Each structure stands twice: as C-alpha cells, then as structure tokens.
C-alpha cells in the first residue's frame, strides 16, 4: 500500500471506531475485554514488547485495562475497551488503491469501515503492523485514541515496511 496515494479522511464527531472481529466482547465472568493475540515472528515480537513497555497508562482519558488472554502483544483501555494488537498480519485492504488513510501525530493508519459501522485502524509504513480498535460507544472522540498512541508507536516501531 502506498499510503500517500490513498484518500485521507479525518475522522471526527460520531463515527464508530470498533473492530467487530478482533474484540470478542466482554466475558460474563469478569467483564474483561478479550482479544485474539497475534503470532508474529521474533523480530516483530521484540518490537511489540518494546511498544507494550512504552504505551501510555491512559488513552482517550481511559485507564489501561488489558484484554484477556494477557499478552505483551495486546493492550486495552477503558470499558468498553479500546484495543491495541501489535504484530497483526498485513491487511489485504492495503492493496486497494481506494483505501482510506488517516494520519495522527506523524503516524499513518489504514482506515477500514466495518459492516456494523465501526472502524479498524492499522499502522502503515512501520516495521510492524499495529491495529487499534475503538468501541462504537467511544466514537464521539474521533481520532483522540490514535493521537494518544502516536508517541509510543513512533518510539517503539521504526518507520519502514513490515516483512
């Protein structure tokens, strides 16, 4: 995907920002969010562990509440949870010349609208793919979660093309 050849759309106001597939919802036993843990290679795992180390304690004014199962490759904030997964596969949508992209504080993101009206964001032009999903209930804050995460992504995941 050539990020700069794609349309850019700024996401503000009430658009939904959640990933239907990645965020499995809440467990009835402990009300914790769950997320599928990626299985990247050793190099990407090392980058993701560094990202986990530098992630903010708050995103969109929500305290960190990591999803189950616990992993250095996933993180969460709030309830319903904003979910981050590091080391995900390259989304096939990156091959689409009509794909939408956004930029938040120097980090490019692929924007994918889901069937339920939610969105999935995946970093572009980084050595590892980082995916962020924001629940529909938090859509009113626009790109605030991506802005909050940008510094950590820039610090831990170098620019370049993921293998």
Across the structure, where does each feature detected by a protein language model lie?
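Bacterial N-terminal signal peptides that target proteins for export
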Residues: 2-14
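C-terminal motif of bacterial Sec signal peptides marking the signal peptidase cleavage site
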Residues: 21-25
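Bacterial signal peptide processing site
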Residues: 26-30
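Post-signal peptide N-terminal segment of mature Sec-exported envelope proteins
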Residues: 35-57
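Extracytoplasmic
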Residues: 43, 79-83, 125-129
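Sec-exported extracytoplasmic/periplasmic mature domains
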Residues: 53-61, 154-158
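Short, solvent-exposed recognition patches
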Residues: 59-114
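Extracytosolic low-complexity repeat regions of secreted or lipid-anchored proteins
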Residues: 91, 95-163
């Amino acid at each position: 995907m050539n990020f700069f050849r794609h349309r850019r759309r700024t996401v503000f106001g009430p658009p939904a920002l959640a990933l239907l597939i990645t965020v499995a919802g809440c467990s009835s036993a402990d009300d914790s969010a769950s997320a599928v843990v990626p299985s990247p290679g050793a190099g990407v795992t090392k980058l993701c562990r560094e990202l986990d180390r530098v992630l903010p304690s708050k995103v969109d004014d929500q305290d960190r509440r990591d999803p189950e199962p616990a992993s250095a490759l996933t993180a969460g904030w709030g309830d319903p949870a904003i979910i981050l997964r590091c080391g995900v596969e390259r989304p096939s949508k990156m091959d689409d010349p009509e794909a939408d992209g956004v930029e938040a504080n120097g980090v490019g993101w692929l924007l994918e609208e889901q069937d339920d009206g939610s969105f999935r964001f995946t970093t572009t032009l980084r050595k590892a793919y980082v995916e962020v999903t924001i629940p529909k209930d938090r859509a009113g804050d626009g790109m605030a979660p991506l802005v909050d995460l940008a510094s950590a992504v820039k610090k831990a995941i170098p620019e370049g093309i993921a293998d």
